[in-house]
Amino acid sequence: MDPQLTEVSQQFERFKAAFARKDYNTCSDLLSQLKVLLTKFTSLPPLFENSPNAAKELTIARDIYEHAVVLSVKTEDQDAFERDFFQLKPYYVDARNRIPQSPQENLILGLNLLRLLVQNRIAEFHTELELLSSATLEDPCIKHAVELEQSFMEGAYNRVLSARQTAPDATYVYFMDLLAKTIRDEIAGCSEKAYDYVSISDARQMLLFSSDQELLTYVTDEHPEWEVKEGFVVFQKAKETAPCKEIPSLQLINQTLSYARELERIV
Protein backbone atom coordinates (compact mmCIF):
# COMPACT_ATOMS: atom_id res chain seq x y z
CA MET A 1 0.00 0.00 0.00
CA ASP A 2 1.10 3.56 -0.66
CA PRO A 3 2.97 4.97 2.40
CA GLN A 4 0.77 8.09 2.58
CA LEU A 5 -2.39 5.99 2.41
CA THR A 6 -1.00 3.69 5.10
CA GLU A 7 -0.27 6.66 7.37
CA VAL A 8 -3.79 8.03 6.93
CA SER A 9 -5.33 4.60 7.55
CA GLN A 10 -3.36 4.11 10.77
CA GLN A 11 -4.20 7.59 12.01
CA PHE A 12 -7.87 7.04 11.20
CA GLU A 13 -7.89 3.82 13.20
CA ARG A 14 -6.55 5.76 16.19
CA PHE A 15 -9.30 8.34 15.65
CA LYS A 16 -12.01 5.66 15.61
CA ALA A 17 -10.60 4.06 18.75
CA ALA A 18 -10.73 7.42 20.55
CA PHE A 19 -14.24 8.00 19.22
CA ALA A 20 -15.41 4.62 20.53
CA ARG A 21 -14.23 5.48 24.03
CA LYS A 22 -15.78 8.97 23.74
CA ASP A 23 -12.44 10.75 24.03
CA TYR A 24 -13.58 13.66 21.88
CA ASN A 25 -10.62 15.92 22.70
CA THR A 26 -8.24 13.34 21.28
CA CYS A 27 -10.58 12.89 18.33
CA SER A 28 -10.42 16.61 17.55
CA ASP A 29 -6.61 16.58 17.67
CA LEU A 30 -6.38 13.51 15.44
CA LEU A 31 -8.94 14.96 13.04
CA SER A 32 -6.84 18.08 12.53
CA GLN A 33 -3.84 15.90 11.71
CA LEU A 34 -5.90 13.76 9.33
CA LYS A 35 -7.13 16.80 7.42
CA VAL A 36 -3.53 17.91 6.89
CA LEU A 37 -2.56 14.44 5.65
CA LEU A 38 -5.49 14.41 3.22
CA THR A 39 -4.12 17.49 1.45
CA LYS A 40 -1.40 15.23 0.00
CA PHE A 41 -3.98 13.19 -1.94
CA THR A 42 -4.40 14.77 -5.39
CA SER A 43 -7.25 12.38 -6.17
CA LEU A 44 -9.55 14.27 -3.79
CA PRO A 45 -11.81 17.22 -4.64
CA PRO A 46 -11.43 19.58 -6.37
CA LEU A 47 -8.57 18.07 -8.46
CA PHE A 48 -9.86 14.48 -8.82
CA GLU A 49 -6.59 13.40 -10.45
CA ASN A 50 -6.47 9.78 -11.55
CA SER A 51 -4.14 7.53 -9.61
CA PRO A 52 -3.89 3.81 -8.81
CA ASN A 53 -5.19 4.47 -5.28
CA ALA A 54 -7.79 7.11 -6.20
CA ALA A 55 -10.82 5.03 -5.16
CA LYS A 56 -9.24 4.08 -1.82
CA GLU A 57 -8.18 7.67 -1.13
CA LEU A 58 -11.64 9.04 -1.96
CA THR A 59 -13.33 6.42 0.21
CA ILE A 60 -11.18 6.95 3.30
CA ALA A 61 -11.39 10.74 2.95
CA ARG A 62 -15.18 10.53 2.77
CA ASP A 63 -15.23 8.27 5.84
CA ILE A 64 -13.06 10.74 7.74
CA TYR A 65 -15.33 13.69 6.95
CA GLU A 66 -18.42 11.66 7.85
CA HIS A 67 -16.88 10.93 11.24
CA ALA A 68 -15.99 14.62 11.54
CA VAL A 69 -19.64 15.58 11.05
CA VAL A 70 -20.80 13.11 13.70
CA LEU A 71 -18.02 14.31 16.04
CA SER A 72 -19.32 17.88 15.70
CA VAL A 73 -22.73 16.65 16.86
CA LYS A 74 -21.20 14.86 19.84
CA THR A 75 -19.31 18.03 20.80
CA GLU A 76 -22.38 20.20 20.04
CA ASP A 77 -20.41 22.42 17.66
CA GLN A 78 -22.72 23.64 14.89
CA ASP A 79 -20.01 25.72 13.21
CA ALA A 80 -17.76 22.67 12.91
CA PHE A 81 -20.73 20.70 11.58
CA GLU A 82 -21.25 23.22 8.79
CA ARG A 83 -17.56 23.31 7.85
CA ASP A 84 -17.18 19.54 7.81
CA PHE A 85 -20.43 18.99 5.94
CA PHE A 86 -19.36 21.37 3.17
CA GLN A 87 -16.05 19.49 2.91
CA LEU A 88 -17.94 16.19 2.77
CA LYS A 89 -20.61 17.18 0.25
CA PRO A 90 -18.41 16.89 -2.90
CA TYR A 91 -17.90 13.22 -2.07
CA TYR A 92 -21.66 12.73 -2.26
CA VAL A 93 -22.12 14.75 -5.44
CA ASP A 94 -18.96 15.06 -7.56
CA ALA A 95 -17.45 11.69 -6.60
CA ARG A 96 -20.69 9.74 -6.95
CA ASN A 97 -19.51 7.95 -10.10
CA ARG A 98 -16.03 7.27 -8.73
CA ILE A 99 -16.79 5.35 -5.52
CA PRO A 100 -19.79 3.35 -4.19
CA GLN A 101 -22.41 5.25 -2.21
CA SER A 102 -21.73 5.55 1.50
CA PRO A 103 -24.18 3.74 3.81
CA GLN A 104 -24.05 6.85 6.02
CA GLU A 105 -24.96 9.33 3.28
CA ASN A 106 -28.68 9.68 3.93
CA LEU A 107 -28.16 9.82 7.68
CA ILE A 108 -25.69 12.71 7.24
CA LEU A 109 -27.96 14.50 4.75
CA GLY A 110 -30.86 14.18 7.19
CA LEU A 111 -28.71 15.60 9.98
CA ASN A 112 -27.88 18.60 7.82
CA LEU A 113 -31.57 19.19 7.09
CA LEU A 114 -32.28 19.14 10.82
CA ARG A 115 -29.49 21.65 11.42
CA LEU A 116 -30.96 24.03 8.85
CA LEU A 117 -34.38 23.65 10.45
CA VAL A 118 -33.02 24.37 13.93
CA GLN A 119 -31.25 27.46 12.60
CA ASN A 120 -34.48 28.58 10.88
CA ARG A 121 -32.79 28.51 7.46
CA ILE A 122 -35.94 27.30 5.76
CA ALA A 123 -35.02 28.50 2.25
CA GLU A 124 -31.75 26.54 2.39
CA PHE A 125 -33.65 23.56 3.79
CA HIS A 126 -35.83 23.46 0.68
CA THR A 127 -32.88 24.11 -1.62
CA GLU A 128 -31.16 21.02 -0.22
CA LEU A 129 -34.34 19.00 -0.71
CA GLU A 130 -34.50 20.02 -4.37
CA LEU A 131 -31.06 18.45 -4.91
CA LEU A 132 -32.15 15.03 -3.65
CA SER A 133 -33.44 12.23 -5.84
CA SER A 134 -36.95 10.85 -5.42
CA ALA A 135 -35.48 7.63 -4.01
CA THR A 136 -33.46 9.55 -1.43
CA LEU A 137 -36.54 11.51 -0.38
CA GLU A 138 -38.16 8.19 0.59
CA ASP A 139 -35.33 7.31 2.97
CA PRO A 140 -36.46 7.31 6.64
CA CYS A 141 -33.72 9.77 7.63
CA ILE A 142 -34.84 12.30 5.03
CA LYS A 143 -38.57 11.72 5.56
CA HIS A 144 -38.13 12.32 9.27
CA ALA A 145 -36.63 15.77 8.63
CA VAL A 146 -39.26 16.65 6.01
CA GLU A 147 -42.17 15.66 8.26
CA LEU A 148 -40.59 17.58 11.11
CA GLU A 149 -40.36 20.74 9.01
CA GLN A 150 -43.99 20.39 7.93
CA SER A 151 -45.16 20.02 11.53
CA PHE A 152 -43.00 22.95 12.61
CA MET A 153 -44.36 25.25 9.91
CA GLU A 154 -47.95 24.20 10.69
CA GLY A 155 -47.43 24.98 14.37
CA ALA A 156 -48.10 21.35 15.31
CA TYR A 157 -45.58 21.52 18.13
CA ASN A 158 -46.82 18.36 19.85
CA ARG A 159 -45.90 16.37 16.74
CA VAL A 160 -42.47 18.01 16.65
CA LEU A 161 -41.72 17.05 20.25
CA SER A 162 -43.06 13.52 19.92
CA ALA A 163 -40.88 13.01 16.82
CA ARG A 164 -37.88 12.79 19.15
CA GLN A 165 -39.05 9.31 20.11
CA THR A 166 -38.98 8.18 16.47
CA ALA A 167 -35.63 9.72 15.49
CA PRO A 168 -33.90 7.39 13.00
CA ASP A 169 -30.55 7.64 14.79
CA ALA A 170 -29.20 8.69 18.18
CA THR A 171 -27.21 11.51 16.56
CA TYR A 172 -30.51 13.23 15.70
CA VAL A 173 -31.38 13.76 19.37
CA TYR A 174 -29.04 16.76 19.73
CA PHE A 175 -30.84 18.77 17.05
CA MET A 176 -34.24 17.51 18.21
CA ASP A 177 -33.55 18.87 21.70
CA LEU A 178 -32.45 22.22 20.25
CA LEU A 179 -35.66 22.39 18.24
CA ALA A 180 -37.74 21.57 21.32
CA LYS A 181 -36.03 24.36 23.24
CA THR A 182 -36.68 26.82 20.40
CA ILE A 183 -40.37 25.90 20.41
CA ARG A 184 -40.72 26.21 24.19
CA ASP A 185 -38.91 29.54 24.23
CA GLU A 186 -41.29 30.86 21.57
CA ILE A 187 -44.34 29.67 23.51
CA ALA A 188 -42.91 31.09 26.75
CA GLY A 189 -42.34 34.49 25.15
CA CYS A 190 -45.92 34.65 23.89
CA SER A 191 -47.35 33.41 27.20
CA GLU A 192 -45.66 36.00 29.38
CA LYS A 193 -46.95 38.75 27.09
CA ALA A 194 -50.50 37.37 27.11
CA TYR A 195 -50.90 36.51 30.81
CA ASP A 196 -49.86 37.83 34.20
CA TYR A 197 -49.94 34.30 35.60
CA VAL A 198 -51.21 30.80 34.79
CA SER A 199 -51.69 27.66 36.84
CA ILE A 200 -48.85 25.15 36.89
CA SER A 201 -51.11 22.68 35.11
CA ASP A 202 -51.86 25.14 32.29
CA ALA A 203 -48.21 26.16 32.02
CA ARG A 204 -47.19 22.52 31.75
CA GLN A 205 -49.66 21.94 28.93
CA MET A 206 -48.76 25.15 27.10
CA LEU A 207 -45.04 24.40 27.24
CA LEU A 208 -45.60 20.76 26.27
CA PHE A 209 -44.04 19.14 29.32
CA SER A 210 -45.11 15.72 30.56
CA SER A 211 -44.62 16.46 34.26
CA ASP A 212 -44.66 19.36 36.72
CA GLN A 213 -41.04 18.65 37.63
CA GLU A 214 -39.92 19.15 34.02
CA LEU A 215 -41.75 22.48 33.99
CA LEU A 216 -40.17 23.60 37.27
CA THR A 217 -36.70 22.65 36.02
CA TYR A 218 -37.31 24.65 32.83
CA VAL A 219 -38.45 27.69 34.83
CA THR A 220 -35.40 27.49 37.09
CA ASP A 221 -32.92 27.07 34.24
CA GLU A 222 -34.42 29.26 31.53
CA HIS A 223 -36.72 31.79 33.23
CA PRO A 224 -35.49 32.61 36.74
CA GLU A 225 -37.45 35.87 36.50
CA TRP A 226 -40.67 33.87 36.70
CA GLU A 227 -42.04 33.07 40.16
CA VAL A 228 -43.75 29.83 41.14
CA LYS A 229 -46.06 30.18 44.13
CA GLU A 230 -49.36 28.81 45.40
CA GLY A 231 -49.82 26.57 42.37
CA PHE A 232 -49.26 29.32 39.80
CA VAL A 233 -46.48 30.48 37.51
CA VAL A 234 -46.27 34.27 37.80
CA PHE A 235 -44.63 35.86 34.78
CA GLN A 236 -42.32 38.82 34.99
CA LYS A 237 -44.39 41.94 34.54
CA ALA A 238 -43.73 43.70 31.29
CA LYS A 239 -42.27 47.07 31.83
CA GLU A 240 -44.90 49.70 31.44
CA THR A 241 -44.20 51.83 28.47
CA ALA A 242 -43.86 55.47 29.27
CA PRO A 243 -46.86 57.54 28.14
CA CYS A 244 -46.33 59.36 24.90
CA LYS A 245 -45.69 63.02 25.27
CA GLU A 246 -48.32 65.30 23.82
CA ILE A 247 -47.40 66.42 20.33
CA PRO A 248 -47.19 70.24 20.16
CA SER A 249 -49.42 70.40 17.10
CA LEU A 250 -50.12 74.15 17.21
CA GLN A 251 -46.42 74.92 17.43
CA LEU A 252 -45.69 72.63 14.47
CA ILE A 253 -48.38 74.27 12.36
CA ASN A 254 -47.02 77.75 13.09
CA GLN A 255 -43.49 76.66 12.25
CA THR A 256 -44.62 75.07 8.98
CA LEU A 257 -46.50 78.22 7.93
CA SER A 258 -43.46 80.32 8.80
CA TYR A 259 -41.23 78.12 6.62
CA ALA A 260 -43.74 78.39 3.78
CA ARG A 261 -43.74 82.20 3.97
CA GLU A 262 -39.93 82.31 3.96
CA LEU A 263 -39.82 80.05 0.90
CA GLU A 264 -42.37 82.25 -0.83
CA ARG A 265 -40.15 85.30 -0.29
CA ILE A 266 -37.12 83.47 -1.69
CA VAL A 267 -39.01 82.44 -4.83
Curated annotation (Swiss-Prot):
Tissues where this protein is expressed: Ubiquitous with highest expression in flowers.
PROSITE patterns: PCI
Record-listed N-acetylmethionine modification sites: M1
Induction: By cytokinins.
Keyword annotations from UniProtKB, A to Z: Acetylation, Cytokinin signaling pathway, Proteasome, Ubl conjugation
Domain (PCI) ranges: 79-251
Gene disruption phenotype: Decreased rate of leaf formation, reduced root elongation, delayed skotomorphogenesis and altered growth responses to exogenous cytokinins. Increased sensitivity to heat shock and increased tolerance to oxidative stress. Decreased 26S proteasome accumulation. In flowers and cotyledons, epidermal cells were larger than those in the wild type.
A Gene Ontology cellular-component term: nucleus
Function: Acts as a regulatory subunit of the 26S proteasome which is involved in the ATP-dependent degradation of ubiquitinated proteins. May help to control the degradation of one or more factors that repress cytokinin signaling. Plays an important role for balancing cell expansion with cell proliferation rates during shoot development.
PANTHER family: 26S PROTEASOME NON-ATPASE REGULATORY SUBUNIT 8
Similarity section: Belongs to the proteasome subunit S14 family.
Protein name (record): 26S proteasome non-ATPase regulatory subunit 8 homolog A
Protein species of origin: Arabidopsis thaliana (Mouse-ear cress)
Annotated gene: RPN12A
